[in-house]
């Protein structure tokens, strides 16, 4: 749960389709690798595969959204809460944008959409919560905002170097 500066409480659910998205990406990159001798680091998905990949990523996003909505509905029902409005914020995705009757694609890796007036959710961490903001629609920033504060240590390193009891101590009083 998070609270804004006006006292409004928000239920925040941070999930995605990380594994499904990785499988989707790997499948299409492997297919692209079959089509030429370009080194993997320089590979890109093109032509018919690009269109299929775009639709596959949309399916991953729909899966992630459905997952969040199911979690939210379960919590809201059990707690007898009215969870409106819902701000659904994606990150790490490909989208088609239309500005002034022109269409273009934006790949957002570590970023979320921040169109003019759009509600923006920027997760900081489990302890400090999220930033709720409003998009500025800045063309120089690809109509985007950062998604999170970034990770300074890989998850695997955290698991190796920290304990659950340390985590509980840091998170004491955080609900």
Predicted regions and their residues:
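Domain-length cofactor-binding catalytic modules of enzymes
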Residues: 2-175
């Amino acid at each position: 749960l998070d609270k804004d500066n006006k006292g409004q409480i928000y239920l925040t659910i941070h999930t995605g389709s990380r594994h499904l998205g990785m499988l989707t990406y790997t499948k299409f990159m492997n297919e692209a690798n079959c089509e030429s001798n370009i080194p993997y680091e320089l590979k890109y998905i093109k032509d018919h595969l690009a269109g299929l990949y775009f639709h596959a990523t949309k399916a991953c996003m729909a899966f992630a959204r459905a997952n969040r909505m199911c979690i939210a509905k379960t919590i809201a029902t059990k707690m007898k809460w009215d969870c409106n409005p819902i701000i659904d914020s994606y990150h790490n995705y490909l989208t088609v944008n239309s500005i002034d009757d022109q269409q273009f694609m934006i790949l957002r890796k570590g970023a979320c959409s921040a169109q003019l007036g759009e509600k923006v959710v920027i997760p900081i961490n489990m302890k400090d919560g999220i930033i709720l903001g409003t998009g500025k629609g800045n063309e120089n920033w690809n109509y985007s905002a950062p998604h999170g504060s970034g990770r300074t240590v890989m998850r695997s390193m955290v698991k190796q170097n920290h304990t659950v009891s340390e985590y509980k101590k840091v998170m004491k009083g955080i609900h």
